[in-house]
Amino acid sequence: MKIGIVGAMAQEVEILAGLMTDKTEHKIGSAVVFEGEVNGKSVVLLQSGIGKVAAAIGTTVLLQGFKPDVVINTGSAGGVAQGLKVGDIVISTETAYHDADVTAFGYAKGQLPACPATFKSDEKLTALAEKIAQKQGRRVKQGLICSGDSFIAGGERLAQIKADFPPVTAVEMEAAAIAHVCHAFGVPFVVVRAISDAGDGEAGMSFEEFLPIAAKQSCEMVLGMLAELE
């Protein structure tokens, strides 16, 4: 099995890249792809860049050029569900765009034409992520992860997302685009991210401070999953 791993920023992929052996680096457009082995498993690791378009470009490059069997999106997210704290793990059951609106034509909020209302994560990958989180003794929550091209720092924007998507667990800027591309190509995916901030008025300061912690936590989750993927 070849495992695709996607992170937006250097901080979100550098630990895994550092563990990779027989590593080859490819720069394709805005995407950086590291190809090699991690703990004996065949891995292609994408640093996509930030935002939905960069994530979609990179994921398309990954799927077309390197043909992974599954995709895991790793990195950080802003916690929205009550009780989530920095370092907690969120696992996607589904993803949606919080900034897409074609409701004038009868679509659900966040739904684009010719697409489902949400992109469902692979149930086996979701269950594996939950198993690893429990095995590692982590606080974890499964649910809807919403994506958009804005860093959410509380206020009206966060309130609107909660109103539009009551089950929302966490927010970030790439997952739904990655899921969209995986859906289009028929590749199973899951999002496994660690909370770096609470998506509130202190989010910017919290994100800068806690990103390294979130990156380490999500990386440890991915390594646990790699050990059991066959």
UniProtKB/Swiss-Prot annotation:
Provide the alphabetized UniProt keywords: Amino-acid biosynthesis, Hydrolase, Methionine biosynthesis
Reactions catalysed according to its record: S-adenosyl-L-homocysteine + H2O = S-(5-deoxy-D-ribos-5-yl)-L-homocysteine + adenine; S-methyl-5'-thioadenosine + H2O = 5-(methylsulfanyl)-D-ribose + adenine; 5'-deoxyadenosine + H2O = 5-deoxy-D-ribose + adenine
Q: Which organism is it from?
A: Actinobacillus succinogenes (strain ATCC 55618 / DSM 22257 / CCUG 43843 / 130Z)
The protein depicted here goes by the name: 5'-methylthioadenosine/S-adenosylhomocysteine nucleosidase
Tell me the HAMAP family matching this sequence: Salvage_MtnN
Listed binding positions for substrate are: G78, I152, M173, E174
Q: Where are the transmembrane segments?
A: none
Return the CDD domains for the record: MTAN (cd09008)
Q: Which EC class is this protein assigned?
A: hydrolase
Biological process GO terms, please? L-methionine salvage from methylthioadenosine; L-methionine salvage from S-adenosylmethionine; nucleoside catabolic process
